């Protein structure tokens, strides 16, 4: 491609991305066809899927992951999509797609999914592991923490364990919060 063609493609790409980010999917897709050979074309597809994560199907996500396994944005899109599934309480979908992650919000959704599909005991055991961490956990954990606190797994020993960990980690706000559970 010559300079003029590259400049035109770059301009078209920018416009298509802008449309995608504004939720104007039809306009973005109309421009997408002319960008099939453009090196950043996968990022336009990323933007299109991102703009409608709540409506994006498992098949669409899987197809994107298969087409672009090495694209740096692929794991991010997948995590964002999984979080949307958690927000929508799509437990079977989430449960079938669990994997080891350091993302605390996803971990909470995965445990909630495990509970939601009936593996209650294992989910409550995993909840204990999440709850004892000496840091505040994401809001996504709150529903399963609520259930867990109503079980025999919740004890003064565990409260003190987390309290001590929070103090050692300098998490004073969490330590103050935990005092409500101390008797």
Language-model features: locations:
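Alpha-helical solenoid repeat scaffolds
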Residues: 1-183
